[in-house]
Amino acid sequence: LDMQEIKSLTARAAKRWGEKIGLVFDEWNEQLSFQEIEDRSNQIANMLQVLGVRYGDRVAVMLRNQPEFPLTWLALAKLGATIVPINVNYKEYDAQYILHHSEAIVIVTSQEFLSLLQKIRPSLQTLKTILSIDQSDDPNVVDFRAMCETAPTTPTTLPVFPETLVNIQYTSGTTGLPKGCMLSHEYWLTIAKKVVEQHPHLTHSDVLLTAQPFYYMDPQWNLLGAIAVGAKLVVLDRFHPSTFWEKVRQYGVTFFYCLGIMPTLMVKAPRSPLDRENNVRTILCSAIPPHLHRELEERWGAPWYEVFGMTETGGDISVKPHDHDRLLGTGCIGKPDKDRTVRIVDVHNRPVSRGEVGELLLRGLGMMDGYFKDPDATCAAFQGGWFHTGDLVRMDEDGYIYYVGRKKEMIRRSGENISAAEVEEVMKMHPAVQYTACLPVQDELRGEEIKAYVVVKEGQVVPPHELIAYCTEHLAYYKIPRYWEYRSELPRTPSERIAKHVLANEKADLRIGSYDRIDDSWR
């Protein structure tokens, strides 16, 4: 892959695999050939030009996993314009902030979100046009599909460069306002090249599947990986644990990527005699629960490989096939990829010894260009020429890296540093527990105490004393949560991680509504 920008990639796919199906949208019962992907994205690009979109302009997209989302993304890349993906779960405040901060001049959306956008439109000085993929009676809304139908399918001739921005991808974040990661053509093509030339070595015979929203980055690199080799990408509306593997079987999927609590929810779903009746050859996953790793492989018959990456940096560290068997279930995230250099440092940015825990720093090709309109945050993130991930890891004597937890998610109780991830991992091993989240609670005596939010499996009842006894058996005494709260579900980020910042800000006193282990009472 010697492409310098995305439009060369789509043109190449149309020429090589024109009539082959490249995209399947399960929820919308629609499929597109590589030629149709090329033609329709060209139409959108030409239509947006008529509306005044130029090189460097920002265009927001607030859609579910519908064909118009990835097609608009490709169209903007061809124009040298920049997409601003908007989370469909955003309400007025979040949507207004991102549209205002990004200075988007156009937004592509659907009928579902028009009322929200009309409420905030008066405060958006730069927003000129609202395009809806559904027909609207509102004279201030432009019909996306009608305009596309009359637009030519000829490719745009505007020059686009490796450093041209494709996305301003706002991170869901856990603290503060979202930051816009500036992602270039080089960023995206570095990832596409990696999944083709390195493991998992995608080929034209692969069938990829994504169950994540297109406003998150993973479906986007899945799409480019598929276009690069002429593979098919199946797009689900979202992740449904009860039907996920049914869809994998239905479409003959050979590869997928997942992360967060997705593997835990998969393995907790009822078993089926058809579990191993699938074509999956390899699975990439971020944060595979070590205690479930072997069960995941034995149940579905495919290898699961740990990978580490961030919106800011792309793909960085992974377990390679020759290491898979030895590292199975160890929690190891592997070694740096070919285009990455790592450093592990203490709080003073001094390298730590092998085996010691420190913050992971990254350097290499194809990383973000910085945070949009935030030079201070960019300088802080790239201090000393290294990207500071905020993740705590350790490296063993052989150079293998083990994830410990987020720097900001370390709980300090009576002078002891406690990894929230470690406590959560132990609790998830309880047979009745679906998933958990641990947060710090301020305490005058100890500095911080641990609060555990617990979601139990359907039909299960587990009193606090049973979970406390389980933790006592498996954890050091100072790691046992003091406060316990049960929930039917927990809020999630777009990347299927627990949205701990939402939990932390729900109430002024996190002890309220919790069982107190020390006082043996509910607060």
Which residues fall in each region the model found?
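Conserved AMP-binding/adenylate-forming core of the ANL superfamily
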Residues: 2, 19-66, 70-74, 91-96, ...
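Conserved pre-ATP/AMP-binding loop-to-beta segment of ANL
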Residues: 19, 132, 149-170, 177, ...
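Conserved AMP-binding A3 loop
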Residues: 31-35, 166-190
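A short helix-loop-beta submotif of the ANL/AMP-binding
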Residues: 58, 64-84, 88-92, 100-106, ...
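AMP-binding/adenylate-forming catalytic core of the ANL superfamily
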Residues: 90-96, 107-109, 256, 342, ...
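ANL superfamily adenylate-forming
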Residues: 114-162, 270
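Conserved AMP-binding/adenylation subdomain of ANL enzymes
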Residues: 189-207, 215-254, 265, 269
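Gly/Ser/Thr-rich phosphate-binding loop
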Residues: 228, 250-258, 267-327, 341, ...
